[in-house]
Amino acid sequence: MRTLVVDHPLVAHKLTVLRDKNTPSPVFRQLTEELVTLLAYEATREVRTEPVTIQTPVSTTVGTAFTKPTPLVVPILRAGLGMLEGMTKLVPTAEVGFLGMARDEETLDIITYAERLPDDLTGRQVFVLDPMLATGGTLREAIKFLFKRGASDVTCICLLAAPEGLAKLEEELGEANVHIVLASIDEKLNEKSYIVPGLGDAGDRLYGIAG
């Protein structure tokens, strides 16, 4: 497993505004989209390409195109949906799948309550979108789910991570071909497993509290 924290003034600035508790939901959504596009630029550096011959208005030349099958983008519901537009703006030809995961309140296990993915992910580069890597449980189960479908190259784009969650993920995934791309690794998890200083509940701040 590899981890990259994107060091860029625009990333730092947009993340600072996201953290501010006074930032309203419409601004939060817009900044999330912009921040994900910046992170995705780095996350796609190793996307698979092949040479293609094209005709310009002047002459024939050799350019670059994605190999087939094209990348698959998988937001984890619901907060990951707020990251999707920022990713597909950069990679509009990518296919999109979905994973819905939640913690069972009785067993505390992560359960998959919804999925819309190809049955066979062999040979696909998969980009998972999940804003907060706190304990790492949800992301771990999402990656395992994708591996069971045949994926072998998974990149996860997150806004924030806690050191504890990253360590747990690395312990369980080991040498698996997983790349984590982040805007920041924060200080710690608190007693409620919230990232500190964090930015609060990303889903609530993106969409408001439904209940």
Curated annotation (Swiss-Prot):
The UniProt note on how this protein's activity is regulated states: Allosterically activated by GTP.
Q: Where does 5-phospho-alpha-D-ribose 1-diphosphate bind?
A: R78, R103, D130, P131, M132, L133, A134, T135, G136, G137, T138, D201
Which enzyme class, named as a word? transferase
The protein's annotated pathway: Pyrimidine metabolism; UMP biosynthesis via salvage pathway; UMP from uracil: step 1/1
Write down the required cofactor(s): Mg(2+)
Task: Give a GO biological-process term.
Answer: UMP salvage
The residues that hold uracil are: I195, G200, D201, A202
Q: Name one GO molecular function term.
A: uracil phosphoribosyltransferase activity
EC number(s) on record? 2.4.2.9
Has UniProt tagged this entry with the keyword Transmembrane?
no
Catalysis performed (reactions): UMP + diphosphate = 5-phospho-alpha-D-ribose 1-diphosphate + uracil
Q: Which family does it belong to?
A: Belongs to the UPRTase family.
For this protein, the record's PANTHER family field holds: ADENINE PHOSPHORIBOSYLTRANSFERASE (PTHR32315), URACIL PHOSPHORIBOSYLTRANSFERASE, CHLOROPLASTIC (PTHR32315:SF4)
- Which purpose does this protein serve, as stated in its record? Catalyzes the conversion of uracil and 5-phospho-alpha-D-ribose 1-diphosphate (PRPP) to UMP and diphosphate.
Question: What name has this protein been given in UniProt?
Answer: Uracil phosphoribosyltransferase
- The scientific name of the source species is Pseudarthrobacter chlorophenolicus (strain ATCC 700700 / DSM 12829 / CIP 107037 / JCM 12360 / KCTC 9906 / NCIMB 13794 / A6)
